[in-house]
């Protein structure tokens, strides 16, 4: 039926199995979005990343996991392995189609749908308790925001969302501070002052 297929995979072997199976198929959907998207992508092998980039398989990852659930990662994987998890910089450099999500409501955090701890985790590569999560995989704030907005819309084929530009639906947030200018350590403190859908204010904090 030409629909995008979404599969969830955490762990090197699980990701490899999903990517290997998807790579055996030709693109079946009509739009520019990936025919298969794989959620989470904890610690993919280089071969899985290469195949995904070549076949146009999309990856959706959530740095909030290492930020919010650091104890579990350290207890089960150890810090050195954990530093290789959610390798955002490597994925971007590979050319694979990539975006962010919060994975709400599953995320173990005070406000699972809050995107700002996720962005902070991607930028600082530090957990809530300060644990180093692999700074070589960090991205800048603008890149993290784009992965959360434009790239997320593109991933699922929403062609008039994700950007503020002529002809788009004017869905946007007004924040209480400039996320591009504040110190990265303050990103999780950002508040939404207003939310606009289709150019109409549907939420105001004041």
Which residue ranges define each predicted feature?
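His/Asp/Glu-enriched, well-ordered alpha-helical/loop segment
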Residues: 2-6, 13-36, 41, 46-50, ...
